[in-house]
């Protein structure tokens, strides 16, 4: 570039005004930022949040105590104790605990479950004050399942073609 062209460019401040125009265009464009606690963005049906144990529509818990989720958990965060076999030959859990401090939210437990009993739900706001509150027992997991059942069923139905 010649010295004359360089001088004309710097005197006319072409780059400066180009930058101002670009800034003004972006200033008046619609914003992509959400004001988080007041506005929440959409979550994917495959989102892996807080764990929950589901029930059948008749109220019976789904978990059949097969312990596949306990076996596949890479963080060894799941502990299950199976009860004795019932008269109809089925088993249910006596104890189902998840240590959420250990959990890495990989979703293997959900994928391994043959009856869709353990799922990772849409809730991601479960911060606590103590570590003990992050130790989920069977009652807490069933309560989560009852609270989020509509969203859980919808997410599983949306994800069904890909399973």
UniProtKB/Swiss-Prot annotation:
[4Fe-4S] cluster 1 binds at residues 63, 66, 69, 113. GO terms for cellular component: plasma membrane. It is an enzyme of class 7 (translocase). It is found in: Cell inner membrane. One of its GO terms (biological process) is aerobic respiration. [4Fe-4S] cluster 2 binds at residues 73, 103, 106, 109. Its cofactor is [4Fe-4S] cluster. Keywords: 4Fe-4S, Cell inner membrane, Cell membrane, Iron, Iron-sulfur, Membrane, Metal-binding, NAD, Quinone, Repeat, Translocase, Ubiquinone. PROSITE patterns: 4FE4S_FER_1, 4FE4S_FER_2. It is a peripheral membrane protein. One of its GO terms (molecular function) is 4 iron, 4 sulfur cluster binding. It catalyses: a quinone + NADH + 5 H(+)(in) = a quinol + NAD(+) + 4 H(+)(out). Gene3D superfamilies: 3.30.70.3270. The keyword Cell membrane applies. The keyword Cell membrane applies. Binds 2 [4Fe-4S] clusters per subunit. Its EC number is 7.1.1.-. InterPro entries: 4Fe4S_Fe-S-bd, 4Fe4S_Fe_S_CS, NADH_quinone_OxRdtase_chainI. Its main location: membrane. NDH-1 is composed of 14 different subunits. Subunits NuoA, H, J, K, L, M, N constitute the membrane sector of the complex. NDH-1 shuttles electrons from NADH, via FMN and iron-sulfur (Fe-S) centers, to quinones in the respiratory chain. The immediate electron acceptor for the enzyme in this species is believed to be ubiquinone. Couples the redox reaction to proton translocation (for every two electrons transferred, four hydrogen ions are translocated across the cytoplasmic membrane), and thus conserves the redox energy in a proton gradient. Belongs to the complex I 23 kDa subunit family. This is NADH-quinone oxidoreductase subunit I. The gene is nuoI.
